[in-house]
Amino acid sequence: MSQVNMRDMLKAGVHFGHQTRYWNPKMGKYIFGARNKIHIINLEKTLPMFNDALSFVEKLAAGKNKILFVGTKRSAGKIVREEAARCGSPFVDHRWLGGMLTNYKTIRASIKRLRELETQSQDGTFAKLTKKEALMRSRDLEKLDRSLGGIKDMGGLPDALFVIDVDHERIAITEANKLGIPVIGVVDTNSSPEGVDYIIPGNDDAIRAIQLYMGAMADAVIRGRSNAGGATEEFVEEAPAAESAEG
């Protein structure tokens, strides 16, 4: 069973919320008090909620389900990318494109284009083109990879979303809600918990806190997969077959 403890959360600064004047009253029940006009999150509430979310993710991973990691703001992107890669999960770290879930058919066409360009860049096609055309395709490849590289092997809609900063990723949450995809989210004192199925009340800005959330989630995925007897790389290997089955 994947678990975090109080000490880890305190060390990472999970308890530091936002300035009191920016608070969202819907988060009131998770606030312990205030210090120097900063809300302090009640970690006695966060701890069981965080561990419930980890157990949920572990169970999903044990059933070979896909958890999409989402964190596009500057402080989160790099950590999201690294931890998703470590556990072989899909991720969005740059920008959420509207319709990434609700208009997946269009997204799938863009992923197909990304794969074609990747092949062309490796099989010598680019070298046979004019300098201008090769440059244009290289730029297209770079742009598509930045936006869709993290989900190109997803092979269909995810079974859950894990989101850092629910306000920043509100479009992703709305899309998941429309499709009935469960959402796990880190919710700070200035954010609304609406649309989040598994709320983790906590600091969504501090790099150490983000590292704790992402590391624990990646560990839960790895543990779930190993319990199911599946390899971490399974997601990457199975994806092309799943994608063709979708089409």
From Swiss-Prot:
- So what family is this one in? Belongs to the universal ribosomal protein uS2 family.
Recorded hits in Gene3D superfamilies, A to Z, give: Glucose-6-phosphate isomerase like protein, domain 1, Helix hairpin bin
Q: Name one GO cellular component term.
A: cytosolic small ribosomal subunit
- Which of UniProt's keywords are assigned here? Ribonucleoprotein, Ribosomal protein
Q: Which domain of life is it from?
A: Bacteria
Q: Record's Pfam families?
A: Ribosomal_S2 (PF00318)
The UniProt entry, under PANTHER family, shows: 30S RIBOSOMAL PROTEIN S2 PROKARYOTIC AND ORGANELLAR (PTHR12534), SMALL RIBOSOMAL SUBUNIT PROTEIN US2M (PTHR12534:SF0)
Alphabetized GO MF terms: structural constituent of ribosome
Family matches, as InterPro entries: Ribosomal_uS2 (IPR001865), Ribosomal_uS2_bac/mit/plastid (IPR005706), Ribosomal_uS2_CS (IPR018130), Ribosomal_uS2_flav_dom_sf (IPR023591)
Which residues does UniProt assign to the signal peptide? none
- Please name the source species: Ectopseudomonas mendocina (strain ymp) (Pseudomonas mendocina)
Protein name (record): Small ribosomal subunit protein uS2
State the Gene Ontology BP annotations: translation
Instruction: Tell me what gene encodes this.
Output: rpsB
Q: Which CDD domains match?
A: RPS2
